[in-house]
Amino acid sequence: MVREEVAGSTQTLQWKCVESRVDSKRLYYGRFILSPLRKGQADTVGIALRRALLGEIEGTCITRAKFGSVPHEYSTIAGIEESVQEILLNLKEIVLRSNLYGVRDASICVKGPRYITAQDIILPPSVEIVDRAQPIANLTEPIDFCIDLQIKRDRGYQTELRKNYQDGSYPIDAVSMPVRNVNYSIFSCGNGNEKHEILFLEIWTNGSLTPKEALYEASRNLIDLFLPFLHAEEEGTSFEENKNRFTPPLFTFQKRLTNLKKNKKGIPLNCIFIDQLELTSRTYNCLKRANIHTLLDLLSKTEEDLLRIDSFRMEDRKHIWDTLEKHLPIDLLKNKLSF
């Protein structure tokens, strides 16, 4: 049982996980409540969380398979019970768990006769199979069977354009949706002016993350969406044309790293973690997903590298620039690292 208290402006909200169970390796269930909410608030929170849970949570999927010289996806391969299309559909159903960024390679290489399951996939270290018994194909004859795979972390439903795949490489329409279903219901209680609402939220996931983890990530994504409005007043945001247009200076991370090394040899930039740089949660999470953990990792990236990060925006770039302007002077580094 989990209980958290969040102080609101006029009320104290409480949330609980009232039920949690594992129905199978690929089906987790969690039931949560949030209360007390004023009339109408439960519906607002329920709609927002449901949309965020179903559309904003990232998942890892197999997005491409290369069989070799196979003319089309409806072909059959001698010694294999399933057609190429059936194998692609089975690969589409494989549930993976990871925190990888970008595209990774995987493969299957076995010799028949035997059943091929998810446990036969050779994966990079950052990827884990949720259900190793998921079927892929049945080899009925003593043949060598090898497939090259691509794995990607994304969100939502990704449809690949069908082209002429003469090299035997076929795209897989990936469903990067770890949350399988979300329901919410509202219960009203109290009398008169004391009347309030209780929100019940049910979450089913595919096993790549728990319902509690999904709820945390969805809530974090919603907070990130509203952060610009929270900072609008303090930044003096105006809708007047061109008033606050940001023209970024040349992003010279590598040049700054060179200058730092010239001024002070042996500065352990790998010991300065990005959580010390007072970044916003959104910027911090983008960098962490790209495996940028230290100041050295950050300084070694070019502007193009950063802009290729999923969900990384120009606002994040500006924020990083301003933060580095604040923290990169040598005397400040000396004070922080106690040289």
UniProtKB/Swiss-Prot annotation:
Assigned keywords, A-Z: Chloroplast, DNA-directed RNA polymerase, Nucleotidyltransferase, Plastid, Transcription, Transferase
Record region (Alpha N-terminal domain (alpha-NTD)): 1-233
Residues covered by region (Alpha C-terminal domain (alpha-CTD)): 264-339
Name this protein carries in UniProt: DNA-directed RNA polymerase subunit alpha
Source lineage: Eukaryota, Viridiplantae, Streptophyta, Embryophyta, Tracheophyta
Enzyme Commission designation: 2.7.7.6
Top-level division of the source organism's lineage: Eukaryota
SMART domains with a match to the protein in the record: RPOLD (SM00662)
Domain notes: The N-terminal domain is essential for RNAP assembly and basal transcription, whereas the C-terminal domain is involved in interaction with transcriptional regulators and with upstream promoter elements.
SUPFAM superfamilies assigned to the protein according to its UniProt record, in alphabetical order: C-terminal domain of RNA polymerase alpha subunit (SSF47789), Insert subdomain of RNA polymerase alpha subunit (SSF56553), RBP11-like subunits of RNA polymerase (SSF55257)
Gene3D superfamilies listed in its UniProt record: 5' to 3' exonuclease, C-terminal subdomain, DNA-directed RNA polymerase, insert domain, RNA polymerase, RBP11-like subunit
